[in-house]
């Protein structure tokens, strides 16, 4: 099972001190536990926006891909990329991966209102903008034939309640944060892997 991770710093594992505690190895371990032989490659780049997926998709397709997990959107939000623009880039990336025969699972933009650097007075606005962005992404992914894992719905309350889920920079996940994200992503990834094997 050729598992490829694409997207931004979360997909790349920034914030964790050990590689095995990052998203790719955690998801690969879950798949191995269900009997899959997994070849993992991480094409994600810290700081990537949805527009940067083009190069990552080319790399994933060139290396061969059965399942692509895409985590993107946070940098689009922080750089004020309009939702329709980022969503179209994501749609195109998912569509290309699907045409290459891959199953695609997407974790949409996180709710950035839980980040400590966001002033309390702006949290409601940031949360609303994050939700709108994620909704645009969801529609784009479905149109392109991908699967959306509603990670933000599961982990946002966890990150809001537990500062230990953040790394020292208070922006990226810690090892514990990556475990929470992987647990939320895993059911969709495992379902797509089961379909691919069948």
Placement of each model-derived feature along the sequence:
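Alpha-helical cap/lid subdomain in secreted, periplasmic
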Residues: 54-198
């Amino acid at each position: 099972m050729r598992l490829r991770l694409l997207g931004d710093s979360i997909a790349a594992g920034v914030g964790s001190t050990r590689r095995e505690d990052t998203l790719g190895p955690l998801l690969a371990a879950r798949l191995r536990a269900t009997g899959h032989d997994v070849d993992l490659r991480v094409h994600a780049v810290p700081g990537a926006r949805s527009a940067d997926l083009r190069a990552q998709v080319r790399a994933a397709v060139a290396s061969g891909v059965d399942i692509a997990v895409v985590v993107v959107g946070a940098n689009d939000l922080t750089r004020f990329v309009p939702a329709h623009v980022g969503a179209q880039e994501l749609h195109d990336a998912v569509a290309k991966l699907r045409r290459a025969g891959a199953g695609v699972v997407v974790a949409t933009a996180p709710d950035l209102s839980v980040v400590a650097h966001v002033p309390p007075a702006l949290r409601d606005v940031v949360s609303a903008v994050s939700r709108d962005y994620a909704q645009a992404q969801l529609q784009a992914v479905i149109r392109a034939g991908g699967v959306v894992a509603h990670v933000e719905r599961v982990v946002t309350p966890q990150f809001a309640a537990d500062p230990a889920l953040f790394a020292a920079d208070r922006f990226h996940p810690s090892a514990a944060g990556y475990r929470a994200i992987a647990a939320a992503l895993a059911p969709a990834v495992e379902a797509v892997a089961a379909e691919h094997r069948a």
